[in-house]
Amino acid sequence: MKPEIISLLISFMDKVVLAILVGLITSGMFLCILSRCRPTIDISPIIAKGADTISGRTIYRIKVINRTKSPIVDIKSQLHVFKNHQTATGEIWKSKTVQLKRSDPIVIDKYDKLDADVNYAYRFVTYEDLEKIWDNDNVQFLRFRIYARHSISGFGAFAYRDYRLKRNTIRSGEFSKGDNFEIA
């Protein structure tokens, strides 16, 4: 081959390889930065038991706080009662769904301490009698699960909380407004 063709081929390969390498590195950096934009969700360690303001029926509430600096979307939540069953080959856990009245809000706003309406907090509610359903701490527990996506990055996050002891979990009262899980 002629030296000019070899020089042209080396120059072309140098530019292509360099462009591909730079593209891969910048894409990796972008994904690394973007992957840090995941929802951060806190779930209350206790369940508030109160009366519905309209019907007066007993209502149970689980409060979540979106700690992310952006809104979270595509929210899905579940509450289950898990029960331990002994079988010939060992133990298994069976679950029963507890119906949540508002289990999939469209959005929970970004975390903002200056938000007077506290739109970054949300209360999931059920009218099912948790104290009746959850009748034995030795073989049963409650599990609340939530999945949400970050509104900007699209990355999802899953959070859950297990409630193991009924006497430490269910408290009479209402959650206080704001960035806390206190029951008043």
Task: Describe every region a protein language model picked out.
Residues 32-56:
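Low-complexity, acidic Ser/Thr/Pro/Gly-rich terminal tails and inter-domain linkers that flank the onset
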Residues 48-182:
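Membrane-proximal, non-transmembrane interaction regions of membrane/secretory-pathway proteins
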Residues 1-35:
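Membrane-embedded hydrophobic alpha-helical segments
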